[in-house]
Amino acid sequence: NKDYITKHNRFSPPGVEWLYLAIGDPCVAETCALKECRAEAGELFGLCQFKLNEDYSEKTLVDLTIAEDVLYEDLNRQLENSADEIRKREVKKAVDGIMRKGYAKTPDVSDIKEKFTRWAAYTYARLLSKQIFVPVETEDKELMYSPFQCMAQYFLSLGYAGIIYSSTVFSEGKNVVLFDKDAATPMGKIKKINV
């Protein structure tokens, strides 16, 4: 109901109906959901679990949490080591080719593309997750959220179904925003919680 989506959310502007859920261990997800709602003492909340609909089981989510425990130095070292291994391998093949046939074949560096893509994806995800996803402290949510909203629209345009991201208000929590609010349905009973 568009009457209830009148405020900016991290990934969606007013009027856009996307589904925001806390994910992971049920106890952690419950705590995360309450913190995301900015629950205050005396408020009553209803929480339930959701299940991804079968139509969406093959859809791909962008996971911005994939590299949270990886250091930039480790990512760079892995890429450098891979490049060194490939260089040594291709130089050896070239020398062997020249010795046997008098010429060297064009080097095969196709596997560096996979290594570089992984490095770029992890570096980008870590950058977004660790340095950008901080709680918004300003009242101007439109200004603070607009980069995230543009990014979400970009991922949507590429065919992704949503984004997994770390909670900014609960360090142990993870959330998902699904670009189709009907991608998941409630299951089980609604648990009433008096904060």
Q: Model-derived features: where do they sit?
A:
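Conserved active-site and cofactor/substrate-binding residues in soluble primary-metabolism enzymes
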Residues: G24-V28, S146
